[in-house]
Amino acid sequence: MKFQSTLLLAAAAGSALAVPHGSGHKKRASVFEWFGSNESGAEFGTNIPGVWGTDYIFPDPSTISTLIGKGMNFFRVQFMMERLLPDSMTGSYDEEYLANLTTVVKAVTDGGAHALIDPHNYGRYNGEIISSTSDFQTFWQNLAGQYKDNDLVMFDTNNEYYDMDQDLVLNLNQAAINGIRAAGASQYIFVEGNSWTGAWTWVDVNDNMKNLTDPEDKIVYEMHQYLDSDGSGTSETCVSGTIGKERITDATQWLKDNKKVGFIGEYAGGSNDVCRSAVSGMLEYMANNTDVWKGASWWAAGPWWGDYIFSLEPPDGTAYTGMLDILETYL
């Protein structure tokens, strides 16, 4: 999400009225390669390293299983770099944190779904912009080495770079690619852009990202798109029923023009008629352009969301009860 503060308290965003299922949405044949949800919790809180169960939480394998049972085959799993690597980006792991992260990843992949590992750090470590491409490459070489033998694991270079030098964003993404490949990992790599990797600003801000290279040719351009007035994902109010499609149209053309493939790694809208139309319209537009769009993941599931406006956590998350029928159309 655009504003980091939204992650500091699990249920700070308020609540929304649920819209019941059965609104006439006809299930179409599955067209996306990957479709699912973010799994949030391990990146919560401001206490570093913090205490598991007090300051942060790991996703619940049983609710992941529930979502897999609904047909989801993709989960973007958040973690915080400072908790995994408390001393330095190139230092030793906190073994308990790594084990818990791996448990979540295994819960996803044992269920036959794909796990996208997401360092949810906004291009920063200990509050400072990551400026060493060498250290970032080492970070990724080490982490990819942990998961290189699991074909269902994929790697997200970092969540939502923002207010950074554009060449640095490009170079950090390339360093991540280089590190992952140096580890012997051959899975897909999801790269993110500057300005919170927004689809609606991608063409103006992140055009240089087309210059990334990968010997495996498995780069996926991950963009995020919220549908409220400022695109921050902090309001349950969507601009209009067509805003979803409108905000990704230019990015779609950019992907086509540059022969790239993309993925909407975060999106959401409130459980109301306007947002339901906006989300449905965006997904339908993507479904009609699967030559460039590989899929999407909702923001977000996770055990500590409470009555958060976009919670997809079973059994009673606001979006689980009010938006899941829209998503099920594409499962």
UniProtKB/Swiss-Prot annotation:
Alphabetized GO MF terms: cellulase activity
UniProt subcellular location: Secreted
pH dependence comment: Optimum pH is 6.0.
Family: Belongs to the glycosyl hydrolase 5 (cellulase A) family.
Induction statement: Expression is under the control of the xylanolytic transcriptional activator xlnR.
Domain of life: Eukaryota
Glycan attachment residues as annotated in the record: N38, N100, N211, N288
Pfam family, one: Cellulase
SUPFAM superfamilies in alphabetical order: (Trans)glycosidases (SSF51445)
GO cellular component: extracellular region
GO BP term (any one): cellulose catabolic process
Main subcellular localisation: secreted
Catalysis performed (reactions): Endohydrolysis of (1->4)-beta-D-glucosidic linkages in cellulose, lichenin and cereal beta-D-glucans
Temperature dependence: Optimum temperature is 70 degrees Celsius.
Signal peptide: 1-18
Alphabetized UniProt keyword annotations: Carbohydrate metabolism, Cellulose degradation, Glycoprotein, Glycosidase, Hydrolase, Polysaccharide degradation, Secreted, Signal
Function: Has endoglucanase activity on substrates containing beta-1,4 glycosidic bonds, like in carboxymethylcellulose (CMC), hydroxyethylcellulose (HEC) and beta-glucan. Involved in the degradation of complex natural cellulosic substrates.
Biological classification of the source: Eukaryota, Fungi, Dikarya, Ascomycota, Pezizomycotina
Enzyme Commission identifier(s): 3.2.1.4
Organism from which the protein derives: Aspergillus niger
Name of the molecule in the record: Endo-beta-1,4-glucanase B
Active site: E160, E266
